[in-house]
Design a protein with these regions (language model features):
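A residue-level signal for conserved active-site and pocket-lining positions in enzyme catalytic cores
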Residues: 38, 113, 161, 201, ...
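Non-catalytic nucleic-acid substrate-recognition regions in nucleic-acid-modifying enzymes
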Residues: 2-157
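C-terminal edge-of-domain segments
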Residues: 159-175
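Solvent-exposed alpha-helices and their adjacent loops that cap or buttress functional pockets
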Residues: 16, 152-153, 162, 207, ...
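Short glycine/proline-rich turn/loop motifs
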Residues: 114-116, 179-182, 267-268
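A generic beta-sheet turn/junction motif
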Residues: 50, 163-165, 220
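SAM-dependent Rossmann-like transferase core, predominantly class I methyltransferases
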Residues: 170-204
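Conserved S-adenosyl-L-methionine
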Residues: 193-282
């Protein structure tokens, strides 16, 4: 494809080679716990700040990979695309027309767009989402994009647009399904606790892997499974995939290296001190 090599160089220079801004979202009240988790990982991240709803940080793309893989208490991790002011549609369309969507998405993708607006002149969510999708289509008609394989095209992409006091913040979701979905459960309970909240409760309670954990009304086993993964030092996202695997900047060699390094840290537990039961055999 014409323009493929120059585009790959731009992706490497602007997305892979530079630090990017990220936002790890959390349940209310867990921001500090998420911040502590981030700081405990082997990451060279900068400017980590806990704010309402999550933690902002700067880092390289592979650190986004590792945060998705390892964090127990975050819901999703967003990568910032751009931030700008716009108080009317003319200004919005002008700024959107300059966004380098080809660095973030393959040509075939029409992402889901989620919009929220607060204290802003532009508040019509559907109209704003339409402008976003239109700018992406126009850009793909005029500028070379990389084409995705059939496998990559099956990975949904999701943009988040937040508008506050006429300032737009556009982000792309690196996680895909919410991160509490660990990819290990076969059956769910009627009203299950999210794994992120169970992990937070265990951390706040000071769970010690050397001490017994007794879960006599375990339901779908959320607490016990989280404790088991912690006791063996298995990353929270070990058994699942992520949306960033469908990005043009994704490098499977780096991802596989990170997984191999994480696997070296697994703990072998001869007799796990976790006892779970429930009257419902399912």
């Amino acid at each position: 494809m014409e323009g493929r090599d120059p585009l790959e160089k731009r992706i490497k220079r602007h997305i892979i080679g530079r630090t990017r801004e990220f936002f790890a979202t959390t349940a209310p009240g867990l921001e500090g716990l998420c911040l502590d988790e981030l700081k405990s990982l082997p990451l060279s991240i900068e400017e980590t700040t806990a704010i309402s709803g999550g933690v902002e940080f700067k880092g390289h793309l592979h650190e986004c990979y590792l945060a998705n893989l390892c964090l127990h208490t975050t819901n999703r991790i967003l990568m910032r695309v751009d931030s700008f002011r716009a108080s009317n549609f003319n200004r919005l369309e002008k700024v959107l027309s300059r966004l380098p969507w080809e660095l973030f998405l393959f040509k075939e993708f029409i992402p889901k767009v989620d919009v929220t607006s607060r204290h802003s002149r532009l508040y019509h969510k559907t109209a704003i989402a339409e402008r976003i999708r239109s700018s992406l289509k126009n850009r793909s008609d005029q500028t070379p994009f990389l084409s995705a394989t059939e496998k990559i095209r099956s990975i949904p992409q999701h943009l988040f647009v937040r508008i506050a006091d006429d300032r737009f913040t556009i982000s792309i979701d690196s996680s895909g399904e919410l991160l509490h979905k660990r990819g290990i459960k076969k059956l769910g309970a009627r009203a299950p606790m999210r794994e992120t909240l169970a992990a937070a409760a265990l951390k706040i309670a000071g769970y010690d892997i050397r001490e017994p954990l007794i879960d006599p009304m375990c339901g779908s086993g959320t607490f016990s499974l989280e404790a088991a993964m912690m006791s063996r030092n298995i990353p929270a996202g070990w058994y699942r995939n992520f949306a960033f695997m469908g990005w043009p900047c994704f490098r499977s060699t780096r991802w596989n290296h990170l997984r191999r390094e994480a696997e070296k840290m697994f703990r072998h537990v001869d007799h796990p001190l976790i006892f779970a039961s429930d009257k419902d055999p399912k």
